[in-house]
Swiss-Prot record:
Cystine pairs: none
Catalytic activity, as annotated: glycyl-tRNA(Ala) + H2O = tRNA(Ala) + glycine + H(+); a D-aminoacyl-tRNA + H2O = a tRNA + a D-alpha-amino acid + H(+)
Subunit structure and binding partners: Homodimer.
GO BP terms: D-amino acid catabolic process
Its job: An aminoacyl-tRNA editing enzyme that deacylates mischarged D-aminoacyl-tRNAs. Also deacylates mischarged glycyl-tRNA(Ala), protecting cells against glycine mischarging by AlaRS. Acts via tRNA-based rather than protein-based catalysis; rejects L-amino acids rather than detecting D-amino acids in the active site. By recycling D-aminoacyl-tRNA to D-amino acids and free tRNA molecules, this enzyme counteracts the toxicity associated with the formation of D-aminoacyl-tRNA entities in vivo and helps enforce protein L-homochirality.
Compartments (UniProt record): Cytoplasm
Location, primary (coarse class): cytoplasm
Keyword tags: Cytoplasm, Hydrolase, RNA-binding, tRNA-binding
Organism field: Colwellia psychrerythraea (strain 34H / ATCC BAA-681) (Vibrio psychroerythus)
Name by which UniProt lists this protein: D-aminoacyl-tRNA deacylase
Amino acid sequence: MIALIQRVSQASVTVNGEIIGEIEKGLLVFLAIEPLDNEQKAKRLAERVAGYRVFNDENDKMNLNVKQAEGNILVVSQFTLAADTSSGMRPSFTTAAKPEFSNHLYQFFVTQLRDKGFDVPTGEFAADMKVALINDGPVTFTLTI
C-alpha cells in the first residue's frame, strides 16, 4: 500500500466538471493498493497518515500532525503509484491490485481516517479526475506499508 502525501493550503478533486471533494489546509493523499495489501495494512497506513508530523510548530519545525494543525485530509485513488517502472518506456500496471479489491481497501482506509475524526472528502474511485492543489512548502512524502 502506497500513499503519496502532500501538505497543501488547498486542494480539490473534480469529476465531470463538478468539484466532488475539497479541503483547505491539510493533506492531499494519493492512495495506491497493491495485490498483497489487506485491512491491517490499510489501518496502519491510516494511523501513519493521521499521525505524520509534517506541519510546522511555533518554532517552524515539522512537529505537528494534521489534526494538531487543524487541517483535513482529501483522499484520491491513484493506481499509477503502484506501477512497475523498472524497465522500458511504458509503465506496467501488473503490480497494482485489481479494481474490486482496491476499492474495498480504499473505502476501508477512508473509513479508518473518518473514525479518527476527519471529514475526509474523496475523489471517485476509478473515475477520470482533475486534481487541483496548492502544495505548501512544497512538502511531499511517500509512505509505504
